Amino acid sequence: MLARGLPLRSALVKACPPLLNTGREGWGHHRVGTGEGAGISTRTPRPYSEIPSPGDNGWINLYHFWRKKSSQRIHFRHIENFQKYGPIYREKLGNLESVYIIHPEDVAHLFKFEGSYPQRYDIPPWLAYHQYYQKPIGVLFKKSGAWKKDRVVLNTEVMAPEAIKNFIPLLNPVSQDFVSLLRKRIQQQGSGKFAGDIKEDLFHFAFESITNVMFGERLGMLEDTVNTEAQKFIDAVYKMFHTSVPLLNLPPELYRLFRTKTWRDHVAAWDTIFNKAEKYTEIFYQDLRQKTEFRNYPGILYHLLKSEKMLLEDVKANITEMLAGGVDTTSMTLQWHLYEMARSLNVQEMLREEVLNARRQAEGDISKMLQMVPLLKASIKETLRLHPISVTLQRYPESDLVLQDYLIPAKTLVQVAIYAMGRDPAFFSNPDKFDPTRWLGKDKDLIHFRNLGFGWGVRQCVGRRIAELEMTLFLIHILENFKIEMQQIGDVNTIFNLILTPDKPIFLVFRPFNQDPPQA
């Protein structure tokens, strides 16, 4: 929208020492059956007030939260709290109170109560910026019928299988150009390999990809000279995420009132995002109006305008949100995926073998290849299990429900701790191991309501299909052309910057696998 972040069991224990005797079942909560209705009791539910909690004084809780410097390690804090309180707990920080759950069956039950218009938690500083500066909003912030109206239109243009097929010829050349970029770096280093941190290159790749899908035009982000205006947009998205965390726990009005530097930086980042997105949209909008025929798919913007199912202001708002959400999220997941493959060379070879076999069987047809790489697609799920973009998935249930024998009132903020779930041995065997095959087993109970990296249901990530296609194509071309290794042996942990990011640079080595790149 992020070890692996706790790379080894020893690192997990070091970061989160066991608070209860976990025995064989995980972190202090009992393992519950995974059949239909598991964990849902017919007994009279206990009241909400009895849900385990560190205390009801949100300001004292917030003081301890800050004292322990928990802001950037909130995902570890979730693990600690589940160790201490069991599979459900509530916590109040400042004015915000949430119920946290971890069990997949509880998640499945929660989603039955999300209603026709599911609501997620709105990031306070984001919402405050949009409201105070009267910025147009898209599906990220819209509610009820207004959200549904936009979402139905976007689903047709962004999520439908027919639409996804149109994106392949736009995204595939970007991945091929990234391979060319790495080959050029290998030549420049003159050692037969390239070693370094490619985080910025992945940002460029992700922005080049999402803008090509949106506008049907390339910006040239992978060329020798990077577009300076586009770089400003990328930098602004990065700053927007990183300035969000310090603004989460107090009312944004306070930061605005005192004009704190963090708030000013946050506003400046959003201003740049809106200004650049508006400029791009207007340029391509005017260009599209002058054309009557297109040799290739002209992009999502054109189809949204052509359908006339959205007002122009709504089109611009949703394009802005998809552009902002399509840079750090995708690039960070790809960085983690490369990291995992570099640490698990046997898995990397399995993935490469599948890709090469698919290339031969499909005779170079990339569309056919995409249907023949189930392990590679599973590896993306596995990366998101270990390194989810978001640490929680949130819902406000439409009516009262019972979870773990506790009554949860309607409109209570319930957060699914997906990072903690992904690290729990009660739900994933050998949870620290990068094992894509776990997603391909025949026992569906083993993956039931566990694949939540893109959210779930009608309010899942609107850019999910674009991101999945973009990452799959990228990994196909990388695996065909390079062997990936770690430059330095060592674990990389995670920090919470609204999305989960590495706590230090990831240095990788790319060695040519073939001298001649495969033909598309």
From Swiss-Prot:
Which residues bind heme per the record?
461
The protein's required cofactor(s) are namely: heme
Reaction equations catalysed: 6 reduced [adrenodoxin] + cholesterol + 3 O2 + 6 H(+) = 4-methylpentanal + pregnenolone + 6 oxidized [adrenodoxin] + 4 H2O; 2 reduced [adrenodoxin] + cholesterol + O2 + 2 H(+) = (22R)-hydroxycholesterol + 2 oxidized [adrenodoxin] + H2O; (22R)-hydroxycholesterol + 2 reduced [adrenodoxin] + O2 + 2 H(+) = (20R,22R)-20,22-dihydroxycholesterol + 2 oxidized [adrenodoxin] + H2O; (20R,22R)-20,22-dihydroxycholesterol + 2 reduced [adrenodoxin] + O2 + 2 H(+) = 4-methylpentanal + pregnenolone + 2 oxidized [adrenodoxin] + 2 H2O
Keywords carried by this UniProt record: Cholesterol metabolism, Heme, Iron, Lipid metabolism, Membrane, Metal-binding, Mitochondrion, Mitochondrion inner membrane, Monooxygenase, Oxidoreductase, Steroid metabolism, Steroidogenesis, Sterol metabolism, Transit peptide
| Annotated organelle transit peptide span | 1-39
Q: What PANTHER family does the database record attribute to this sequence?
A: CHOLESTEROL SIDE-CHAIN CLEAVAGE ENZYME, MITOCHONDRIAL, CYTOCHROME P450
**EC numbers:** 1.14.15.6
Pathway named in the protein's UniProt entry? Lipid metabolism; C21-steroid hormone metabolism; Steroid metabolism; cholesterol metabolism
| InterPro entries registered for this protein in UniProt | CYP11_CYP27_families, Cyt_P450, Cyt_P450_CS, Cyt_P450_E_grp-I, Cyt_P450_sf
How the protein assembles, per its UniProt entry? Interacts with FDX1/adrenodoxin.
Q: Name one GO cellular component term.
A: mitochondrial inner membrane
The record's Pfam families line, in alphabetical order, gives:
p450
Q: How does it sit in the membrane?
A: Peripheral membrane protein
Q: Which domain of life is it from?
A: Eukaryota
Q: Which GO terms describe its biological process?
A: C21-steroid hormone biosynthetic process; cellular response to peptide hormone stimulus; cholesterol metabolic process; cortisol metabolic process; glucocorticoid biosynthetic process
Name the family the entry cites: Belongs to the cytochrome P450 family.
Q: Which GO terms describe its molecular function?
A: cholesterol monooxygenase (side-chain-cleaving) activity; heme binding; iron ion binding
The free-text function statement in the UniProt record for this protein reads: A cytochrome P450 monooxygenase that catalyzes the side-chain hydroxylation and cleavage of cholesterol to pregnenolone, the precursor of most steroid hormones. Catalyzes three sequential oxidation reactions of cholesterol, namely the hydroxylation at C22 followed with the hydroxylation at C20 to yield 20R,22R-hydroxycholesterol that is further cleaved between C20 and C22 to yield the C21-steroid pregnenolone and 4-methylpentanal. Mechanistically, uses molecular oxygen inserting one oxygen atom into a substrate and reducing the second into a water molecule.
Query: To which species is this protein native?
Result: Capra hircus (Goat)
- Disulphide-bonded residues: none
Question: Know the name of this protein?
Answer: Cholesterol side-chain cleavage enzyme, mitochondrial
* Annotated segments matching region Disordered: 27-48
The subcellular localization recorded is: Mitochondrion inner membrane
Report the top EC class in one word: oxidoreductase
